C-alpha cells in the first residue's frame, strides 16, 4: 500500500504501524530483569550455561587480558590467539577440519552462503530457512530455488535443472520455528549425485543433537569435504558469535571474500572466552544434551502434542496471531515465559507458542510449566492444531 507523503518523509510510518496493530503483528521490547522471576521456556540457553560460573569466569578472564572489544576487523587488529583457539576447539568438537569465527550466527550465514555461491550459481533453500539464510540467498546474486519444507525430492528436481557452474543446498539442521530435523543424510546423497555443496546451519543442533556435536556429526557426515557447517555460540554455548566450519580451502576463501568477516569488528574477547569455557563444560558434562531432549519430550506431553520433539524446540501451533500473543502474555502473567512466533517468522495461519527446553529444568519447574500451560492452552483449545 502506497501512503502519500504529507508533512514528513516518515509520515507513512504511522499508517504502517496501524496495519501491524490491526493484523495482530506488532512487536515490542520487554526488558527482563537480571534475576529472572519467571520460569524460562523461551530463551535459547539450552544447556543452561549462560549463567554458569565457569562460563562467566571465562568471559571475565578474557576481558581482563584482551580488553572490552576486539578493536578492529580480524584482518586489522581484531585477531587474537583466543579467536584461533576457539576456532580450533570448535572445529575439532564437531569433526570439521577448521573453523572461522564471525561476530554472530547471522553474519556467519551471510558470509558463508554469499561467499560460496554468487552469480553463476544455484542455491536451493528450504522454505522454512532462517531469515539470515534467506537474506544471504537474496544478497548472493545467485539463482535461488525455494523448495517445500524438508522435501528431498524437490531438492533433487531443482538440482536436475541446474545449468549453473555450481550449486549449493542450504538447510538448517534443526529448524528454529518448528524444531523439525532436516533430512541431512538424504540431502547429502542428493548433493553428491549432482556435485552440489551442502551447507547446514547447526544453530539449534549444536549442544543438543549428536551428543552435543550436532546433527551433521550424528549422521556421520562430520568432516565430509562437500559439507559446510555454520553455527552460533549464542544458543547452547550461552555466549555470542558465529562460526563457519569446513575445509581449509573454505576458510581461506571466506577470509578473502566474506564481507561480514572482512568489514566487521572481530568478536569481542569476552564472548570468545565465555564460549570456550562453555564448550569445555559441554565436553565434560555429557548428560546435558540428553537432559534437554528428555525435558522437551515432557513439555510436549504437557501440551498434548501428538509427536514428540527431536530437539529443544517444542512448537504449539495456535493459528491466529492474536490468539498466540494472548496465550504468551497469559503464560508470562502466570510466571512462565514462552516464545510467540507470528508472521513473517512463520507462515500465515501458523502462529504459535515456541517453548524451549533447558538442561537446567527440574521436576519442580516442570510442574509449574504443567500447571500454567495446561490452564492457558485449555482456554484456547479451539484454535489449537
From Swiss-Prot:
Residue numbers binding substrate: 27, 130, 345
Residue numbers binding pyridoxal 5'-phosphate: 105-106, 176, 201-204, 232-235
Cofactor: pyridoxal 5'-phosphate
Membrane spanning stretches: none
Any Gene Ontology biological process: biotin biosynthetic process
Pathway: Cofactor biosynthesis; biotin biosynthesis
Catalytic activity, EC: 2.3.1.47
Enzyme class: transferase
One family name in Pfam for this protein: Aminotran_1_2
Residues bearing PTM N6-(pyridoxal phosphate)lysine: 235
Alphabetical UniProt keywords: Acyltransferase, Biotin biosynthesis, Pyridoxal phosphate, Transferase
Superkingdom of the source species: Bacteria
Catalytic activity: 6-carboxyhexanoyl-[ACP] + L-alanine + H(+) = (8S)-8-amino-7-oxononanoate + holo-[ACP] + CO2
GO MF term set: 8-amino-7-oxononanoate synthase activity; pyridoxal phosphate binding
PANTHER family xrefs: 8-AMINO-7-OXONONANOATE SYNTHASE, CLASS II AMINOTRANSFERASE/8-AMINO-7-OXONONANOATE SYNTHASE
Subunit comment: Homodimer.
Function of the molecule: Catalyzes the decarboxylative condensation of pimeloyl-[acyl-carrier protein] and L-alanine to produce 8-amino-7-oxononanoate (AON), [acyl-carrier protein], and carbon dioxide.
Family, similarity comment: Belongs to the class-II pyridoxal-phosphate-dependent aminotransferase family. BioF subfamily.
Protein name (database record): 8-amino-7-oxononanoate synthase
Organism: Mycobacterium leprae (strain TN)
Amino acid at each position: 500500500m502506497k501512503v502519500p507523503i504529507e508533512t514528513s518523509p516518515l509520515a507513512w510510518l504511522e499508517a504502517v504501524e496501524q496495519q501491524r496493530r490491526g493484523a495482530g503483528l506488532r512487536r515490542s521490547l520487554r526488558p527482563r530483569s537480571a534475576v529472572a522471576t519467571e520460569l524460562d521456556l523461551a530463551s535459547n540457553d539450552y544447556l543452561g550455561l549462560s549463567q554458569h560460573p565457569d562460563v562467566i569466569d571465562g568471559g571475565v578472564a578474557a576481558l581482563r587480558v584482551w580488553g572490552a572489544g576486539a578493536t578492529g576487523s580480524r584482518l586489522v587488529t581484531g585477531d587474537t590467539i583466543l579467536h584461533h583457539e576457539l576456532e580450533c576447539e570448535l572445529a575439532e568438537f564437531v569433526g570439521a577440519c577448521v573453523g572461522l569465527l564471525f561476530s554472530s550466527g547471522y553474519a556467519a550465514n551471510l558470509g558463508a552462503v554469499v561467499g560460496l555461491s554468487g552469480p553463476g550459481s544455484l542455491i536451493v533453500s528450504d522454505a522454512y530457512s532462517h531469515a539470515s539464510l534467506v537474506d544471504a540467498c537474496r544478497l548472493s546474486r545467485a539463482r535461488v530455488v525455494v523448495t517445500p519444507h524438508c522435501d528431498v525430492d524437490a531438492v533433487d528436481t531443482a538440482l536436475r535443472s541446474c545449468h549453473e557452474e555450481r550449486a549449493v543446498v542450504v538447510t538448517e539442521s534443526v529448524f528454529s520455528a518448528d524444531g523439525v530435523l532436516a533430512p541431512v543424510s538424504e540431502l547429502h546423497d542428493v548433493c553428491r549425485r549432482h556435485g552440489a555443496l551442502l551447507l547446514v546451519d547447526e544453530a539449534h543442533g549444536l549442544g543438543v543433537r549428536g551428543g552435543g556435536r550436532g546433527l551433521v556429526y550424528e549422521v556421520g557426515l562430520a568432516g565430509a569435504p562437500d559439507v559446510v557447517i555454520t553455527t552460533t555460540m549464542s544458543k547452547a554455548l550461552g555466549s555470542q558469535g558465529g562460526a563457519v566450519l569446513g575445509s581449509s580451502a573454505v576458510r581461506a576463501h571466506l577470509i578473502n571474500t566474506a564481507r561480514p568477516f572482512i568489514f566487521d569488528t572481530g568478536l569481542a574477547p569476552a564472548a570468545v572466552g565465555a564460549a570456550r569455557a562453555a564448550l569445555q563444560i559441554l565436553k565434560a558434562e555429557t548428560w546435558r544434551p540428553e537432559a534437554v531432549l528428555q525435558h522437551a519430550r515432557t513439555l510436549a506431553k504437557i501440551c498434548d502434542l501428538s509427536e514428540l520433539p527431536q530437539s529443544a524446540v517444542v512448537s504449539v501451533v495456535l493459528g491466529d496471531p492474536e490468539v498466540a500473543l494472548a496465550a504468551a502474555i497469559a503464560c508470562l502473567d502466570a510466571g512462565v515465559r514462552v516464545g510467540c512466533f507470528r508472521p513473517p517468522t512463520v507462515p500465515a495461519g501458523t502462529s504459535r507458542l515456541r517453548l524451549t527446553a533447558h538442561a537446567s529444568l527440574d521436576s519442580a519447574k516442570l510442574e509449574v510449566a504443567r500447571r500454567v500451560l495446561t490452564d492457558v492452552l485449555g482456554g484456547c483449545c479451539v484454535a489449537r492444531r
